[in-house]
């Protein structure tokens, strides 16, 4: 009897430890079209990307950042401008498509070139579907540009970050 109670107690403790001490998975969302830097890494198109190849959806950090890696050291390669990031040739209007692996209530989506916000789309505090697309007007820009796309979550202090390399105007060599 005592052995049965001991085994039951151990099982309850093991279950409670697993349930209450589990670290949340950092799997959420990224821009997959045009291919973001993390999408290119996951597809094997850029060498030496590190752990991002396994979790392109995990670039999450505090709101307000303006870098490609959300200040996560193991994803610092995403902000390395010396890497051969392929650029997608586009016209002056570009449709960005986000893919979500965990959907969160959304404050908004922001798109930046340099320090200039070129577009913002309201999320109305709603949970998005599995994919969301936004068409952004890049008139006034030409040549190689890096777009920082940000998915701001409405009920946390965090956001998800994706950088997309583009050749705006569709002419010239899209490679760095």
Each model region followed by its residue ranges:
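Composition-driven, intrinsically disordered low-complexity tracts enriched in small residues
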Residues: 173-176
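Secretory targeting and sorting signals
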Residues: 1-27
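Extracellular/periplasmic metallocenter environments
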Residues: 131-171
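Extracellular carbohydrate recognition and processing domains
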Residues: 117-139
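Membrane-topology and secretion signals of cell-surface/extracellular proteins
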Residues: 5-6, 10-13, 116-119, 126, ...
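N-terminal "mature-chain" segments and other terminal, solvent-exposed stretches
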Residues: 25-116, 122
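Extracellular/periplasmic catalytic domains that process cell-envelope and extracellular macromolecules
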Residues: 89-90, 103-105, 127-128, 139-143
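Active-site-adjacent structural elements in folded domains
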Residues: 11, 81-82, 133
């Amino acid at each position: 009897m005592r052995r049965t109670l001991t085994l039951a107690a151990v099982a309850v403790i093991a279950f409670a430890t697993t349930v209450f001490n589990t670290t949340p998975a950092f799997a959420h969302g990224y821009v997959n079209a045009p291919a973001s830097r993390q999408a290119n890494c996951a597809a094997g198109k850029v060498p030496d990307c590190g752990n991002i190849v396994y979790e392109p959806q995990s670039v999450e950090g505090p709101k307000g950042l303006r870098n490609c890696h959300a200040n996560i050291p193991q994803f610092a390669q995403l902000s390395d401008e010396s890497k051969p990031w392929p650029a997608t040739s586009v016209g002056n209007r570009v449709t960005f498509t986000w893919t979500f692996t965990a959907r969160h209530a959304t404050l908004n989506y922001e798109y930046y070139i340099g320090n200039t916000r070129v577009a913002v789309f309201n999320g109305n505090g709603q949970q998005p579907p599995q994919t969301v697309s936004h068409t952004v007007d890049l008139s006034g820009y030409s040549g190689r540009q890096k777009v920082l796309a940000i998915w701001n979550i409405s009920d946390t202090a965090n956001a998800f970050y994706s950088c997309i390399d583009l050749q705006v105007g569709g002419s010239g060599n899209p490679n760095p």
